[in-house]
Amino acid sequence: KRLEAMSFSLLDLFALERTAPQLVTVQAQALARAVAESMGYVMSQSGVELRLSVEPGSFPGEPNLLKTLLYNLLDNARKASQSRSSVELLGCTTPQGYLFQVTDHGRGIPQEALDRITEPFYMVDKSRSRKEHGAGLGLALCDKIAKLHGTELTFVSTMGLGTEVSFELEY
């Protein structure tokens, strides 16, 4: 199962290298609801509550890529969280566009790892990643999707308190 997931992630990365996304107008709340629905089962199995606070708004983007981006960020947040905790997906308009932020209250990421976490195959906690069938490709894929949308992932993390990952999609 781990090898299969890694193969699909590698194929996704290669495909993103070769094609430009077809941008359409994306509705933030519809995107967030779709991702939340697809996350429902894994969140409940982990005992982690997904909290949404997403303002109305729209922006240019490729919906399937943005779903993949948010799904992977939320799944990483879930994996870092304890049972009976929560993960938040926030979305709000800004003067420049639309900001998404995923917040967990998990272990946090060591400061020395923050510069490397979007590198393919890099894993902060290898034992947890193997248990969760991770291959170290999820954040590399997220980083690539963000860059294709003209933005970057911003990580703020405190050990023992959790992590916030945000990105802003410009109008």
Q: Predicted segment positions?
A:
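Acidic ATP/Mg2+-coordinating residue in the GHKL
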Residues: 104
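Short beta-strand/loop element within the Bergerat-fold HATPase_c
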Residues: 84-96
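Conserved glycine-rich
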Residues: 150-151
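Conserved micro-motifs of the catalytic ATP-binding
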Residues: 17-22, 54, 58-61
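Short conserved segment of the HATPase_c
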Residues: 109-121
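Short helix-loop "hinge" at the ATP-lid/N-box region of the Bergerat-fold HATPase_c
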Residues: 77-78
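Short conserved segments within the C-terminal catalytic ATPase subdomain
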Residues: 42-51
